[in-house]
A protein has these predicted regions:
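Rossmann-fold cofactor-recognition segment
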Residues: 39-53
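Conserved hydrophobic beta-strands of the Rossmann-like cofactor-binding core
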Residues: 4-7, 69-74
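Residues in the short beta-alpha loop(s) of Rossmann-like NAD(P)-binding domains
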Residues: 11, 35, 129, 172
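C-terminal helical subdomain
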Residues: 164-172, 176-210
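N-terminal Rossmann NAD(P)H-binding glycine-rich loop of SDR-like oxidoreductase domains
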Residues: 10-21
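Catalytic loop of short-chain dehydrogenase/reductase
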Residues: 75-79, 84-99, 107-108, 114, ...
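Conserved glycine-rich Rossmann-like NAD(P)H-binding loop of the short-chain dehydrogenase/reductase
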Residues: 26-38
Length: 210
Protein backbone atom coordinates (compact mmCIF):
# COMPACT_ATOMS: atom_id res chain seq x y z
CA UNK A 1 0.00 0.00 0.00
CA UNK A 2 1.36 3.40 -1.01
CA UNK A 3 2.26 5.67 1.88
CA UNK A 4 1.12 9.28 1.84
CA UNK A 5 2.87 12.25 3.37
CA UNK A 6 2.18 15.94 3.86
CA UNK A 7 5.34 18.03 3.95
CA UNK A 8 5.73 21.70 4.82
CA UNK A 9 8.72 23.75 3.68
CA UNK A 10 10.52 20.88 1.98
CA UNK A 11 10.84 22.50 -1.44
CA UNK A 12 14.46 23.69 -1.35
CA UNK A 13 17.89 22.98 0.12
CA UNK A 14 17.95 19.98 2.46
CA UNK A 15 14.16 19.83 2.50
CA UNK A 16 14.03 19.21 -1.24
CA UNK A 17 16.48 16.33 -0.90
CA UNK A 18 14.25 14.89 1.83
CA UNK A 19 11.19 15.24 -0.42
CA UNK A 20 12.96 13.48 -3.29
CA UNK A 21 14.17 10.69 -1.04
CA UNK A 22 10.65 10.00 0.24
CA UNK A 23 9.25 10.15 -3.30
CA UNK A 24 11.92 7.73 -4.53
CA UNK A 25 11.01 5.46 -1.60
CA UNK A 26 7.42 5.22 -2.83
CA UNK A 27 5.65 7.94 -0.86
CA UNK A 28 2.90 9.97 -2.52
CA UNK A 29 3.67 13.50 -1.38
CA UNK A 30 1.59 16.63 -0.96
CA UNK A 31 4.19 19.36 -0.60
CA UNK A 32 3.21 22.73 0.86
CA UNK A 33 5.93 25.07 -0.35
CA UNK A 34 6.59 28.45 -1.93
CA UNK A 35 8.74 26.59 -4.46
CA UNK A 36 7.25 24.60 -7.33
CA UNK A 37 8.73 21.10 -7.37
CA UNK A 38 8.38 18.99 -10.51
CA UNK A 39 9.23 15.47 -9.40
CA UNK A 40 7.54 12.05 -9.65
CA UNK A 41 5.11 11.30 -6.79
CA UNK A 42 5.18 14.95 -5.66
CA UNK A 43 2.20 17.33 -5.86
CA UNK A 44 3.09 20.89 -4.95
CA UNK A 45 0.55 22.93 -3.02
CA UNK A 46 1.95 26.42 -3.50
CA UNK A 47 1.74 28.84 -0.60
CA UNK A 48 2.75 32.43 0.00
CA UNK A 49 3.86 32.00 3.59
CA UNK A 50 3.78 35.68 4.53
CA UNK A 51 0.28 36.40 3.22
CA UNK A 52 -1.19 33.05 4.27
CA UNK A 53 -3.80 32.85 7.01
CA UNK A 54 -5.98 30.28 8.72
CA UNK A 55 -8.59 30.28 5.95
CA UNK A 56 -6.15 30.03 3.05
CA UNK A 57 -4.23 27.20 4.71
CA UNK A 58 -7.39 25.18 5.32
CA UNK A 59 -8.47 25.72 1.71
CA UNK A 60 -5.06 24.54 0.50
CA UNK A 61 -4.97 21.30 2.46
CA UNK A 62 -6.11 18.00 1.03
CA UNK A 63 -8.03 16.16 3.74
CA UNK A 64 -6.87 12.57 3.57
CA UNK A 65 -5.24 10.01 5.81
CA UNK A 66 -1.49 10.61 5.88
CA UNK A 67 1.21 8.28 7.15
CA UNK A 68 3.51 11.24 7.83
CA UNK A 69 3.02 14.96 8.40
CA UNK A 70 6.28 16.88 8.75
CA UNK A 71 6.83 20.58 9.49
CA UNK A 72 10.13 21.85 8.10
CA UNK A 73 9.10 25.40 7.13
CA UNK A 74 11.51 28.00 8.43
CA UNK A 75 10.92 31.73 8.11
CA UNK A 76 13.74 32.49 10.52
CA UNK A 77 12.72 34.59 13.47
CA UNK A 78 13.42 37.68 15.47
CA UNK A 79 14.35 39.61 17.48
CA UNK A 80 18.01 38.73 17.55
CA UNK A 81 21.52 40.15 17.38
CA UNK A 82 21.61 43.88 18.00
CA UNK A 83 17.80 44.19 17.91
CA UNK A 84 18.15 44.46 21.69
CA UNK A 85 20.32 47.58 21.54
CA UNK A 86 18.79 51.03 22.28
CA UNK A 87 19.40 52.12 18.68
CA UNK A 88 17.33 49.39 17.02
CA UNK A 89 13.79 48.09 17.08
CA UNK A 90 12.43 44.84 15.71
CA UNK A 91 9.07 45.01 13.95
CA UNK A 92 6.32 43.40 15.99
CA UNK A 93 4.50 42.74 12.71
CA UNK A 94 7.46 40.70 11.48
CA UNK A 95 7.61 38.94 14.84
CA UNK A 96 3.96 37.96 14.52
CA UNK A 97 4.48 36.67 10.97
CA UNK A 98 7.27 34.37 12.13
CA UNK A 99 5.10 33.04 14.95
CA UNK A 100 2.25 32.41 12.52
CA UNK A 101 4.33 30.56 9.93
CA UNK A 102 6.40 28.49 12.31
CA UNK A 103 4.15 27.82 15.31
CA UNK A 104 0.51 28.67 14.78
CA UNK A 105 0.21 27.23 11.27
CA UNK A 106 1.17 23.68 12.36
CA UNK A 107 -1.37 23.89 15.19
CA UNK A 108 -4.09 24.89 12.71
CA UNK A 109 -3.07 22.11 10.31
CA UNK A 110 -3.28 19.39 12.95
CA UNK A 111 -6.61 20.65 14.24
CA UNK A 112 -8.00 20.83 10.69
CA UNK A 113 -6.82 17.32 9.80
CA UNK A 114 -7.65 15.87 13.21
CA UNK A 115 -10.33 13.48 11.94
CA UNK A 116 -7.89 11.91 9.45
CA UNK A 117 -5.07 11.36 11.96
CA UNK A 118 -4.83 7.81 13.30
CA UNK A 119 -2.81 6.15 16.05
CA UNK A 120 -0.15 5.33 13.44
CA UNK A 121 0.13 8.77 11.84
CA UNK A 122 3.56 10.28 12.45
CA UNK A 123 3.64 14.05 12.97
CA UNK A 124 7.02 15.74 13.29
CA UNK A 125 8.80 19.09 13.59
CA UNK A 126 12.33 20.15 12.74
CA UNK A 127 13.86 21.88 15.78
CA UNK A 128 17.28 23.25 16.77
CA UNK A 129 19.75 22.69 19.57
CA UNK A 130 19.56 26.43 20.33
CA UNK A 131 16.50 25.82 22.48
CA UNK A 132 18.59 24.18 25.20
CA UNK A 133 20.06 27.58 26.10
CA UNK A 134 23.41 26.56 27.61
CA UNK A 135 25.39 28.97 25.42
CA UNK A 136 24.52 32.47 26.64
CA UNK A 137 25.91 34.08 23.47
CA UNK A 138 23.06 32.56 21.48
CA UNK A 139 20.75 35.41 22.51
CA UNK A 140 21.58 36.63 19.00
CA UNK A 141 19.16 33.97 17.73
CA UNK A 142 16.55 34.64 20.42
CA UNK A 143 13.53 34.86 18.13
CA UNK A 144 14.46 31.77 16.15
CA UNK A 145 15.19 29.75 19.29
CA UNK A 146 11.91 30.81 20.90
CA UNK A 147 9.95 29.64 17.86
CA UNK A 148 11.60 26.23 17.94
CA UNK A 149 11.12 25.96 21.71
CA UNK A 150 7.42 26.73 21.27
CA UNK A 151 7.17 23.95 18.70
CA UNK A 152 8.77 21.45 21.09
CA UNK A 153 6.07 22.15 23.65
CA UNK A 154 3.28 22.17 21.06
CA UNK A 155 4.50 18.75 19.92
CA UNK A 156 4.49 17.47 23.49
CA UNK A 157 1.03 18.90 24.10
CA UNK A 158 -0.43 17.08 21.11
CA UNK A 159 1.33 13.88 22.18
CA UNK A 160 -0.65 13.97 25.43
CA UNK A 161 -4.10 14.56 23.98
CA UNK A 162 -4.19 13.51 20.32
CA UNK A 163 -4.00 10.32 18.32
CA UNK A 164 -0.73 9.87 16.43
CA UNK A 165 2.99 9.56 17.04
CA UNK A 166 4.33 13.07 17.64
CA UNK A 167 8.07 13.66 17.45
CA UNK A 168 10.80 16.19 16.69
CA UNK A 169 14.26 16.14 15.13
CA UNK A 170 17.36 18.16 16.05
CA UNK A 171 19.29 18.38 12.76
CA UNK A 172 22.35 20.01 14.37
CA UNK A 173 23.50 21.25 10.96
CA UNK A 174 22.93 20.38 7.30
CA UNK A 175 26.19 20.64 5.33
CA UNK A 176 25.34 20.77 1.62
CA UNK A 177 27.58 17.82 0.87
CA UNK A 178 25.63 15.73 3.40
CA UNK A 179 22.11 16.59 2.22
CA UNK A 180 21.51 13.15 0.72
CA UNK A 181 22.98 11.25 3.66
CA UNK A 182 21.04 13.32 6.19
CA UNK A 183 17.80 12.87 4.25
CA UNK A 184 18.26 9.11 4.22
CA UNK A 185 19.20 9.06 7.90
CA UNK A 186 16.26 11.15 9.11
CA UNK A 187 13.88 9.17 6.91
CA UNK A 188 15.19 5.99 8.52
CA UNK A 189 14.59 7.42 12.01
CA UNK A 190 11.02 8.30 11.10
CA UNK A 191 10.36 4.86 9.62
CA UNK A 192 11.42 3.23 12.89
CA UNK A 193 9.22 5.37 15.14
CA UNK A 194 6.67 3.49 17.23
CA UNK A 195 3.97 4.49 19.72
CA UNK A 196 6.54 4.34 22.55
CA UNK A 197 8.37 7.24 20.87
CA UNK A 198 5.36 9.55 21.06
CA UNK A 199 6.36 12.96 22.44
CA UNK A 200 10.10 12.40 22.06
CA UNK A 201 12.81 14.33 20.21
CA UNK A 202 15.81 12.79 18.48
CA UNK A 203 19.15 13.86 17.09
CA UNK A 204 19.52 13.34 13.34
CA UNK A 205 21.58 10.21 14.02
CA UNK A 206 18.65 8.67 15.91
CA UNK A 207 19.95 9.19 19.45
CA UNK A 208 17.32 10.34 21.95
CA UNK A 209 17.61 14.08 22.59
CA UNK A 210 14.79 15.52 24.74
Amino acid sequence: MTKKTLLFGCGSKWGLEFTKHLADSGYQINLVSSSSVDYPNVKTLNIDWVSSNETSVKELLVKEEYDLIFFNQNSGGGPGGDDFSPSRDYSVDHWNIHNWINCQLPYIVIKHLSSTITEKTKIGWMLTGLIVGNDTSRYQYAGYASIKSTNLHIMRGFSEFHKGIFFAINPIWFPIEDYKKDAEQISSIIERLESKDNGKSFMKDGVFWL
